[in-house]
């Protein structure tokens, strides 16, 4: 076992006095009013007063990136969903996030979404597109286009389908991760990353939900900030936080007038690693390839290739100095490509406070790190690479002989429960390159030859400070969906496949029993690596293959 390495940041930041920030956060949160995330007796993080006052103002739900809610989701008996229970908009591929606004003066809300080609604003109640801002001049994507694409994914031999799927994937997703993670602030500004900066969009007419979309402001990296934007978040005192794939952390004022940046520890590894990934044509596999989590005390958490790291913001300085509370801890990385998960924070009351990822081993392990002080006399789990590791459990989906399992999804955190899914294709075509398996679980995820099976819950016991497997369900399929948990309905939700149909699956959070299946339909309802979530009305929303989808299973 290695002791936690001591980082040596450029510039040598001094100690951080965070008491003022904590007090300010409490005051601002009180003034902002209770958000859904504020309830739950310490199970959920405090609402960030600088995000839109809604159930989903940022990817992964909130600044803590937990992918869970106290709001009750669907609990009706399983049944095939009728047309009246399904709403969708044909916006075109690539609209992964669906970000909910605060209420406008008249009580209306809108949903913001984006692709590499456009920014859209939709009516919250109907999903009707209210306004569009074109980034690229492209023909409108139609239902006929959607039908043609869906048919092509089913036609011909396996080789024909694989070739078509590979080509389609290149047109559907951005070349990098810059525009994947977005957020909406309390003033209605929708922030989208670009390769070397960030752009804010908003209403051209203030207070009008049907207003055209205006580009409010753009900011490009100065010469001393390197890399492309990967993750985005916002501190509890209102500073935008960005991570770059070169290993830099950035805080930026919301008017783009002030900026702070720091190199993360071990970022000297990034250039060679990124060059190797580029040479192997592995787009999206850079040294940092997931978004970032932020806590209410100024902690900023990012997972790099083989390293889990914390930077600290105190309102005027950004630091990676251990004396300020920052740290960097190694995690196991046998694949050599790091974690596929965005860090998720766990523990918000007076109990244990942890940050959770899956590691980079071929058989991934859910790995939890102490966010703040490592308890005196702490003995980490056997095999841990740092004293900061609090818990580490391999994900086997109930098969003790399993040797490989990876997921590209964040760990769902609900209280001290953690839910993960299997994203390994059931089989691989002969000669198919393993690094291209995303094609199998995305565009071809409804083919039973490739559909992955398995959902697993782990639980942290704050009394014994141990992590254990709580249950495994091997019936559940979740080819590419980012799952979601509702403590209000005691369910974990995902979108999988049953009998060729994309299907909403509801699993009891306490027991792992598959409580209900709601078949939806064909390729249009493929989640395509988007996250699902529960809105305040208890409906499921996600980004489908051809546009946003909303589900409201009713009692038959």
Short names for language-model regions:
Residues 116-123, 127, 195-205, 246-253, ...:
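Structural motif
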Residues 154-178, 195-197, 203-236, 258-289:
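Asp-box/WD-like beta-propeller blade repeats and closely related beta-sheet repeat scaffolds
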Residues 526-556:
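Blade-level signature of beta-propeller repeat domains, shared across WD40, Kelch, NHL, RCC1
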Residues 31-160, 554-556:
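Sequence/structural signature of beta-propeller modules
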Residues 293-404:
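Long, internal scaffold/assembly segments composed of regular secondary structure
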